[in-house]
Curated annotation (Swiss-Prot):
Residues 138-140 form a propeptide. A metal cation binds at C14, C17. PROSITE patterns: HMA_2. Pfam families: HMA. Transmembrane segments: none annotated. Residues 3-67 form the HMA domain. Belongs to the HIPP family. It comes from Arabidopsis thaliana (Mouse-ear cress). The lineage of its organism: Eukaryota, Viridiplantae, Streptophyta, Embryophyta, Tracheophyta. It comes from the Eukaryota. The gene is HIPP31. This is Heavy metal-associated isoprenylated plant protein 31. Heavy-metal-binding protein. Keywords: Lipoprotein, Metal-binding, Methylation, Prenylation.
Length: 140
């Protein structure tokens, strides 16, 4: 029975980190294929009788933080994307004689309250490069 385990690995920045994770996961028993998508920070392991906990533990042993892939609706990254049937939605500008071009399904994006307001203020941006902040950016 072939299984797929999808993991989110934040801060997956360079090709060296990706190859290190690929080699680490290919050493696990049962892993046949490892796919690393750096732009989405996603690692997919496919194989025979894979256990999510063992794959997570192997990634963490390689020195990376890891969690199970939080977007369970296929490979869609739009977790806040909703579809409603046409009888639920309001037709503000529709004419009664026209047919519904959407096929009866209306979609929209729901923006969570956390992202609808600017989060970073001037103080936070200024303290990113401060010498007093131990977690500051090391570019300077």
């Amino acid at each position: 029975m072939s299984m797929t385990v999808e993991i989110r690995v934040p801060n997956l920045d360079c090709e060296g980190c990706a190859s290190k994770l690929r080699k680490t996961l290919l050493k696990l028993k049962g892993v046949e294929e490892v796919e690393v998508e750096m732009e989405t920070q996603k690692v997919t392991a496919r194989g025979y009788r894979l256990e999510e906990k063992k794959v997570l533990k192997a990634v963490r042993r390689a020195g990376k933080a890891a969690e199970l892939w939080p977007y369970r609706l296929g490979n869609s990254h739009f977790a806040s994307f909703y579809k409603y049937p046409s009888y639920v939605t309001n037709h503000y500008y529709s004419d009664a004689h026209r047919t519904d071009p959407t096929g009866g399904v209306h979609t929209f994006f729901h923006t969570p309250a956390d992202y609808s307001v600017a989060v970073a203020g001037d103080e936070i941006a200024a303290s990113m490069f401060s010498d007093d902040n131990p977690h500051a950016c090391t570019i300077m």
